[in-house]
Curated annotation (Swiss-Prot):
Record's protein name: Glyceraldehyde-3-phosphate dehydrogenase 1
Name of the gene this protein is made from: gap1
High-level lineage: Bacteria, Bacillati, Cyanobacteriota, Cyanophyceae, Nostocales
Pathway as given in its UniProt record: Carbohydrate degradation; glycolysis; pyruvate from D-glyceraldehyde 3-phosphate: step 1/5
Enzyme Commission code(s) on record: 1.2.1.12
Entry similarity comment: Belongs to the glyceraldehyde-3-phosphate dehydrogenase family.
SMART domains: Gp_dh_N
Reactions catalysed, as given in the entry: D-glyceraldehyde 3-phosphate + phosphate + NAD(+) = (2R)-3-phospho-glyceroyl phosphate + NADH + H(+)
Amino acid sequence: MAKLKVGINGFGRIGRLVLRAGINNPNIEFVGINDLVPPDNLAYLLKYDSTHGKLRSQVEAKDDGIVIDGHFIPCVSVRNPAELPWGKLGADYVVESTGLFTDSEGASKHLQAGAKRVIISAPTKDPDRVRTLLVGVNHDLFDPSKDVIVSNASCTTNCLAPIAKVINDNFGLTEGLMTTVHAMTATQPTVDGPSKKDWRGGRGAAQNIIPSSTGAAKAVALVLPELKGKLTGMAFRVPTPDVSVVDLTFKTAKATSYKEICAAMKQASEGSLAGILGYTDEEVVSTDFQGDTHSSIFDAGAGIELNSNFFKVVAWYDNEWGYSNRVVDLMLSMIQKEQLAAV
């Protein structure tokens, strides 16, 4: 397979971790980074990470880019994606990780700039025009002739969808309520401050457990249409830096037991969802999953059963590292299918 040339727009938490996840992959070459922050600061943030540790590669800053193990990656600082030099840099795919260009119109500016495809590392605001693809769930629906812009949804949807798929495929999921207990993120302030849309979200991240809204559960229907109208959810933002956990309470169509649900999860984790869905029956806590590349890790010891049709299951996820690895996996899956279609 010819190397996939990738550009990154927005070198924040996800942008940097996508690069970390893919930098040693022989099938990927990063050809450009766009961010308003100067290259020397970007290099520093890439090299030293308070959550995931120091990058083991050699990192050096230049006036116009970053050098990683001798490989130079140009850095530019352009506000309008349509003016980016993706064509000149030879970018096949662009990871749109600013959080700003999540609809078709915004993401298509990268195509105007010469990119061939765009992967939005966030939920799309334009689900009717931008297909949502999750590795292990519906990535096989990628159509090279149509899907020039795709969304990888959110880290929480990536965690919930494999769990919901296993439940629905084996027992039928009739309705469910999800809660994600989510690590704090960059959008939250360190101390109390104003927040236009969400007053509670403006409270100090390190001081509070903050109830919040999330579209992650409803978004599962974008990749599993049979679950449309059957799932919704909410979030609690908690003062931990990384690793989150999904709690799904649900009814099944088929009478079953928690033991059978665990068996189905274990089978999927070793078979069709290997590498995507993990499984543990050990006495684990959140930090045990820091650096885990799975989208979702089913915790057999944490779930409960009320009766033969009503259950609660729990699944962990490294909301930064697991998600960033899925972005890389999705790009590789897409380019492989694209190259096969071209033969």
